[in-house]
Amino acid sequence: MAAGLGSGNMDTTTQASFIPAIWGEKLNDFYRQELKAAAFFEDLSDEVVGGGNIIYIPNISQMTANTKTQGSAVTLNDQTSGKVTLTINTWKEVSFLVEDIVDAFWKKSYRMQEKFMKNAGYTVAKELEQALLNLCRGFSQTVGSSALALRDSNIRAAIAYLDSANVPENDRAFFLHPNVIWNQIQGINKFSLLTNTNGADPVLKGEVYKLYGIPVIKTSLLGTYLGHRDGMLAGRDALNFATSNLSGGMSGEGGVVRLQTQYVQEYLGTLVTADILFGVIENRDTSGVWIKAKSS
């Protein structure tokens, strides 16, 4: 065996000037919540392709059947029709400017401007998503409370509300926060035990994403309000939205987002702006249920 090294050998302290710190090829971008509400609820953007900022949605109520007697005139129905007003009045933008010196020094493999542009587009699209989800607080029908975990009885009560209002069964979805799904609902044997899921492992097979046959849309964008965690059960037509057709806008599940770049000689840099112009409205109150649960 070789003898131990004596003094005077090279080490990391004496050779520090020759040991580089490496910026790796990997870049940690922030995680993005999938935007799902705008893909589910009714999009009326086509109504304003030719211009306009207000969409009127007429309401039709059910007529009344009357008894007809011989020799008498029929009883006429005279409906008073109301309307829902959707106003496009929310304009959100995300902008940044990259000076030439910064662009020259950026590590090229990071493709930083492309990543920042993608982030800007996502951020403004998320504003529409958040606005739609926040509308759940306007539903007059509610179940649950801030003090208790969401229970099976709350879920059934929410479904009963929509059934009583004759909301189409094939156009419904639950919107729930991950904490409510995994910390509360999955603690209910009916929804988690293998024996209660037709032999399919609910975790591996994704059965957690249906409650009584109704799809569950999981989103971390559902906030807390007055101490409880927001959630909802809604029909597709419960909420409506529209995005204005901004020149150069690109359609997607997050609505129409416009992304622009311009070289600004005054600052010797490239200005990038992502923006969206939209409006949201509760269209059918009886087609939605505000679900409240404890926040954790």
Regions found by a protein language model. Name each.
Residues 1-18, 60-67, 116-134:
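Short secondary-structure boundary segments
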Residues 2-44, 48-51, 58-62, 85-89, ...:
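Sequence/fold signature of self-assembling virion shell proteins
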Residues 21, 25, 110-111, 149, ...:
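Generic alpha-helical secondary structure signal
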Residues 44-45, 49-53, 57, 79, ...:
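Charge-rich, low-complexity amphipathic helices
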Residues 57-59, 81-144, 166-176, 216, ...:
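Long, contiguous amphipathic alpha-helices that act as assembly "spine/axial" helices in icosahedral shell
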Residues 62-65, 70-83:
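Active-site-surrounding "flap" and adjacent substrate/cofactor-binding loops of secreted or lumenal enzymes
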Residues 72, 134-135, 287:
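Residue-level detector of alpha-helical recognition elements and their boundaries
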Residues 137-209:
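Extended, solvent-exposed, turn-rich assembly/linker loops in the middle of proteins
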